[in-house]
Amino acid sequence: MSEVVVGLDVHLKNTQVTVMKLNGEIIKRERVQASKKELKRCLESVPKGSGVALESAGFCWPWIDFLKELEFEPLLANPLKVKLRAEDVKNDKVDSRTLAHLTRMNWLPTCYVPPSELRWLRSLLRHRAFRTKLSTGVKNRTKSEFRKRDITLDADLKTLKGRRAAFNLDVFEVKQNVELLDLMDRQSKEIEAMLRRKYGDLKPVQLLMSIPGVGFTSALTLYAEICDIKRFSHPEKLAHYAGLVPKVRQSGEHSSMGRESKGDKWLKWIFIEAAWSHVRFCPEGHLAEVFSEVCNRKGNKKDAIKVVARKLVNVVWYVWTYEKEFVVK
């Protein structure tokens, strides 16, 4: 490690910088504008290869890439775990100073930094998921317009027949919604074609698609969110990362299961979606039996599908790790 470490508290308009020696002596503490030019000027005296810590945030990636360009070692701090180790008093100076302190002592809890290509893929898949949710909202609003006017359609809005029937009703709001749905469908097909063209031949994606209920988009989302299966030495660790392991509360001899641990919300979402699909596509399989058993015992489908999703984590881990296609038994 270099003789100097840096803590950055990055905001949209400004950045608090703390440069610190390994003995804890603060060399520089400065607030600069949130621009690459200003940050480069502020770090001119810092030796190349020094560790530069900053908290994970939605806008941190350009700064990570820029620090790499400047030949520093960017360290992405986990904000939740940093809070557990940081001081109770919290302001900008304490934040950047705390990050520098934790870095020099090798106590900084860090996050995985995916390659830029996978970050772009994650963003595109999340954009696609947002559009799917938006499309569902438009369909629901259109159905609401039908109920207001006591209109009944013989076909679903998902079909061309249903769209044409809705458009021909000559209701202004419904017409606009149908046009919007058509536009979103065309754009979604463009996204799908681009994803298949670019990532359709990836081996992990092909392997994951062998699992019933895991289609191309689900497999690609799992690939983008996990990035490298070697990060997880055991499926239990992947389950924790996905937030699919319930917390255990224990008092004396009594223990109870609480809510799941907080993990990657996108990974948790896609595992649950894939679990629903798997149960539908493979009703005679082991996981479908687990779903039925938990449903009968708890009477709650949501709890049951989470159990299936947790078991699906094991399947994904083994298929990807050992590069063997899933076989239905």
Regions found by a protein language model. Name each.
Residues 1-4, 25, 37, 328-329:
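Intrinsically disordered, low-complexity and often Lys/Arg-enriched segments
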Residues 75-123, 160-164, 254-262:
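Short alpha-helix plus adjacent loop in nuclease-associated cores
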Residues 125-205:
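Glycine-rich, often acidic, oxyanion-interacting loops/wings at catalytic, nucleic-acid
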Residues 36, 41-84:
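Conserved DEDDh/DEDDy metal-dependent 3′-5′ exonuclease domain
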Residues 252-253, 257, 290-329:
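Low-complexity, acidic/Ser/Thr- and charged residue-rich accessory regions of DNA metabolism proteins
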Residues 2-21, 99, 131:
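Gly/Thr-rich phosphate-binding beta-strand-loop-beta motif of the actin/hexokinase/Hsp70
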Residues 91, 207-210, 216, 220-301:
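Phosphate-backbone recognition surface of nucleic-acid-processing proteins
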